[in-house]
Amino acid sequence: MIELSMHTDNWRCLSGSFQKAVEAARKFDLKYIEFGVVDGQDFIEGLGYSPAVSLDSNPIRLRRYLEANGLQASQIDAGYPITGPSGATFGVRYAQRAIQFAAAIGCPRIDTTDGQFKPEGYTDKEVMAITRQNYRQILEWAEDYQVIVNLETHGPYTTNPDTLEAMLQFFDSPWLRLNLDTGNTFIAGGSPVEFLKRFLSKLNYMHVKDVSPDLAAALRGESTGIAMSASAIGQGVNADNIKACIQLLKEARWNGLLSVECLGSDEILSASLAWLRQQLAAPTTPANKPPFMV
């Protein structure tokens, strides 16, 4: 079964709080919510102008708050860049703390990724060697806490399918999986559909993001990732790709979550969720193959 979640980051550009995102999730009849975390304290979050959650928060209280609102955490976004030396210095500890927090609130997965730019002064071979050791340390915690570590397509390494494959093969572990982002793979100049076909067996979670014509014209092939999109899902130039991806998932009998990434206004959220629910409800002919499980 394919279900819907949404990322609280949709409210960051609106200076919206975590509570604002939770209210929207209830309003639009969602059962799941994804959120980013802050390692320590952030005055923006403390003042209520950020939808992130501090890792210093009481996780049990947060879990009760979500349950009281009929919600479960689908994924914790721990997207500080894991690649290279800064990943070793800051990203590993950040991901490990996110794993602990996820386990405490009953969230089955965290999200990790590479940076927007390649580390200066390092060859790709050096970066990959460091990154492999970073994931080795993270996966030790993932295995003990039984929390999946997803690798998201976001930066120059993960939006290159050959490099992404190498990273997913760092270790033969069921705890290292893929979070495919339809918007980032498209902006990077690739095809979300081809990414999905190639990596379906590794797919654990998906960020669904459409792209406006203006944004595509300005950034496609020049950037590798966008945080969210001002375009409602189904109304941008990536809509056909998203529709094809959903069809592939349904044919493969994939079981998992699609997380909505769009501007968190009622108008855009409503249009995005209506379009996605229409795609999920559309008839399909299942392929004669066993289902992919998350």
List where the protein language model places each region.
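Active-site loop/turn elements of alpha/beta-hydrolase fold enzymes
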Residues: 35-40, 78, 112-115, 154, ...
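Active-site acidic/histidine proton-transfer and metal-coordination neighborhood
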Residues: 20-24, 59-68, 72-73, 82-178, ...
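N-terminal small/glycine-rich loop or linker at the start of catalytic domains
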Residues: 1-8, 72-81, 114-118, 224
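Glycine-rich, proline-tolerant flexible connector loops at the mouths of alpha/beta enzymes
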Residues: 34-61, 115-122
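Conserved beta-strand positions in the central sheet of alpha/beta enzyme cores
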Residues: 34, 75-77, 111, 150, ...
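The substrate-binding groove and active-site-proximal loops of carbohydrate-active enzymes
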Residues: 10, 49-53, 80-89, 231-236
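Short, solvent-exposed loop/turn segments at secondary-structure boundaries
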Residues: 17, 46-51, 85-90, 121-126, ...
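Histidine-acidic metal/acid-base catalytic patches
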Residues: 1-32, 67-69, 158-294
